[in-house]
Amino acid sequence: MDNISQWSCEKFVNETSSKAPVPGGGGVAALVGSVGTALAGMVCNLTTNKNEYKEYEEDFKRILSDSKVLQENLLSLINRDAENFLPLAQCYKMKTDTAEEIAKKEEAMQTCLKTAISAPAEIIKITYEAIKLQEELRTKAPALTISDVGCGAVCLKAALQSGWLNILINLKLIKDEEYIKSIKGELLPLVEEGSNLADKIYENINSQLNS
């Protein structure tokens, strides 16, 4: 399979809009999240090693390093999401002419559905951490870069919530109630807290730019 993360922007968009099974919502979520973290990196690169921003020099360097790791992890999840989804797509094509075939398909489906959830789950965890970095940047970034911080937060919220929707669509077909409870218990608090924090960042910056 192609390394989707190395496609041009044009190819990614065209393939997403085609009948191809991937990239889909999960891959798009990972890409949007990666772009959001990249904006944090840009802000930090514009401010490090400059005397006027020396007060937060070490903070900017740390945020730059951390956001770069998150950015690369999200990029890798574009491919992982595609690789995990393709077996599930094949499950839908399995025969169901006999009771044995129905049982075999159902067993395969349950396994593949859980596998398909793993990449969006990681997207949620990573974007949650990235949003917290954006909040720190909001309090320290120069005024001329504050809109980029806000754009990053908005992108990350979109990725966070998109990851959750990709999980929910698969959870609806999973029969393991304990698994469902575990996934929701682990990830829903991150989605809610991360979304609220991203909204706070946006509203604060929007107010600041309108004043």
What are these regions (language model features)?
Residues 67-74, 120, 127, 187-194, ...:
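Amphipathic alpha-helical coiled-coil segments
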Residues 81, 85-155:
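Amphipathic alpha-helical interface segments
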Residues 18-39, 145-163:
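Conserved phosphate/anionic-ligand binding catalytic regions in large, soluble enzymes, centered on
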Residues 4-7, 122, 169-170:
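Polytopic transmembrane helical bundles with strong interfacial aromatic enrichment
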Residues 39-59:
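Phosphate-handling active-site elements
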Residues 130, 145-204, 211:
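Preference for long, well-ordered alpha-helical segments
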Residues 52-88, 190:
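A structural-propensity feature for long, helix-poor, extended segments
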Residues 4-22:
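Short, hydrophobic/aliphatic alpha-helical segments
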